Amino acid sequence: MPGRYCIWAIWLLMAVPLAAAPSQGDTAQQPPPSTTRGYTVFLGGAVVGREELTVLTTADGLDIIGKGRLSGSQDLVINRAEVRYRPDWTPEVYELEASVNGGDTLLYTSFAGTTAVTKGVDAGQQVAHTDTVPPQPVVLPNVFFGAYEALTRRLASGAPAQELNVFVGFGAQGSLRLLSTAAELVQIGTSTLNVRRYALAYAGPRGAATVHVYADDAGSLLRVSIPAQRIDIMRDDLAAATSRTVVYSNPTDEAVVIAGAGFNLGATLTWPASARGSGEAASAKAAATRLPAVVLLAGTAANERDGVVAGVPILGQLAGALADAGFIGVRYDKRGHGQSGGRAESASLGDHADDALAVVRWLSNRRDVDRERIALVGHNEGAWTALLAAARERRIAGVAAIAAPSATGSERVLEQQRHVLEQMKVAPAERVAKIELQERINTAVMTGRGWDSVPADLRKQADTPWFQSFLGFNPARALEDVRQPLLFIHGELDDEVPILHLDRLGELARKAGRSRSVAVVAVRGVNHLLVPASTGEVSEYASLKDRHVSAEVTSAIREWLTKTFAPGR
């Protein structure tokens, strides 16, 4: 028994998958008779292993063969693993040749009826064990993730069973209960892949977990994920930085890749419907009618291009609305996220401004874009990035700042914390202590002194280039260098960045006196997500019925852009 758990106990919760495939009731495509592919294993975002998998589909059934290595608390080398099924999904054989920290494991399990007989050696201990198993169990050894190929094939083969029995290994069995299925779209480079995601509840001898498995149209395994354990197993093409899950799309979206500062930015270009077409005629038309363009920038709560906050794809919806009004919209993944390269952990606000400028330059070089009519639209702290970029590049024709803070970064953090503590009804003494701690953290980040009074775990989170640049950012100072037309727009019910910031920004911009024009717009009945709300409080987000960006917001931006881009401005 101890020998068995030296392998299984370590990886038990690492063996449940995250799959994506078509919706229930669809008929899966026929998988190819033979495939070979690689998978990468992640733990907490770090690579901890790899598997090479060969899958054979014949008239005799399904044969899954693999090898690989997992590193962590134990060094597991899989020299060979095989799971073989008959056509009716009855398992026939499970074999494992592996070593754990140099100790050999050689196990052979044969299935007959309701009996599974395992013989061999497990970490140097002789094994001779018989298990009683239910009919047609799925064999999911915790050390061989490729075995989940059988699970995704079964789930995609028709109306999937609501509950499946699982054989983990000798003396260990469990069950999987199907919770939900969902169709998704994954973008790899500029191509897309239809996937189906299955959410399942796993119960076994060592505990329970919610797991997800993803499959392609043929039912082949794409990904296994256990969020609670921070475990992901992905097919290599999905594991690359060139892949992302598409959570929102407009009918005229086009995936593009933009060269940045030594890496590429994954982006989506949204066209006005009137500009779409193909062939030489469309290219000639685009070149003859250069269109105005808008670069959309997300705040700190969203890292990927659609700007999803609390389930609302803010930037994705803005891009669609502006395209309907005749503007090309570009949104992109922040560096180190989604399909964009670069290092997220070392990026400052200034670095994000550089990325925005890379997009502006890319647009300026296109034959279908009017380089004199390119504006930036930033939401929340994305507006700060837009201001920094506009100060550096006069070719930017204007900046629209949506729900932007007017305070310095340091003041903003303290304002947010006070608000959260008030909502939580924290005792006054505890509230004072937490605010004082945050003040010490802010001082240490900006000066490099005083870290001895800050807990080590908090220092690890706070002592970053991005947070340092955030705390030191001052909108008043940034506005002194911005000469382009400015639009400040805010929802009156914004609970995260209260409406008082709107008037302050307008005053700061007018006082700076550099901008050619300053427009200030307050939108009634709209919250921080730019959608209609009753109270605007964060606690209301989950119950919002209308999750579409307000037409009043998009109309105000459209009208300002039209005025800003007008000839003679």
Name each model feature, range by range:
Residues 288-299:
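Short beta-strand element of the alpha/beta-hydrolase
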Residues 529, 535-569:
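Catalytic active-site module of serine/aspartate enzymes centered on a nucleophile-bearing elbow/loop
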Residues 32-34, 48, 101-195, 199-204, ...:
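Solvent-exposed helix/loop surface patches that form functional interfaces
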Residues 241-279, 284-288:
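N-terminal cap/lid segment of alpha/beta-hydrolase-fold proteins
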Residues 164, 398-481, 511:
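Accessory cap/linker subdomain of secreted extracellular hydrolases
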Residues 314, 346-367:
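Alpha/beta-hydrolase active-site loop
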Residues 358-426:
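Primarily recognizes the serine-hydrolase "nucleophile elbow" in alpha/beta-hydrolase
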